[in-house]
Structure formats: C-alpha cells, structure tokens
Amino acid sequence: IEFYKRFESCELVSEVEEMEKEMTDRFGEPPAEVRVLVALEKIRALASALEIDEILEDSRGVRIRISGNSRVDPKKIVALLKKDRRISLDPTDNEMVLFKPAEKGDEKKLLELKKWLQQIS
C-alpha cells in the first residue's frame, strides 16, 4: 500500500520509473499485475503533463479526450492520423481521438498507448 500511495503522488514519468526501480531493487522482478499498475501510472503522468482530459477504453479501442486547453501538438495528431490507421477521430465528438492498439494483453496495450502519447507530446 505504501508504494501505491507513492505512485499516486508521482507527477512525472521519471518519478514513476524511479519508484519502479526502487521496488524492483527491494522485492525483485514484479508480477504482471504490478507491471500493469506501473504502466498505468506512467500513462497517467504523461496524460497529466499533456493536460489530456480523459482516457477511456471501450469495445472500439482507447478513447482519448483532448480539449483545446491541452498541451498536445495538433500537427502531430494530424500527421499520425495520415500515417497510422489505428488512429481516428470520433465523428460524434471533435475532442475525442480513438486509438486501436494492435497488441493484445493489458501490458502490451499500455506500452503501445504510452508510446503514442509520447509521439503527440
């Protein structure tokens, strides 16, 4: 529980990575559930830094709400829309980007989402 609370207080990906290293040093290689938690915390920190409003997963993929106040570079999203078929705009909501991870499994999908968020920053 101590680590969970500390993860929640991390604001930067580098802080999450430091905690991940500390946890691995103390307890050894973490199980899959902990790796998923760490991946989620990295995504939360990235999304917070970019001022992304929300990230949701549903049957269509990962939905990312990017309002005009965010720090996301719109030109990067447009460029990714042109070259990556996994990314589309929600026709019913002009602030929502739909991302369809190619990978299956929570850990792999989260890694893919993290890489995508880094590309739009």
Regions found by a protein language model. Name each.
Residues I1-S121:
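Accessory helical-bundle/CTD segments and flexible terminal tails appended to RecA-like ATPase motors
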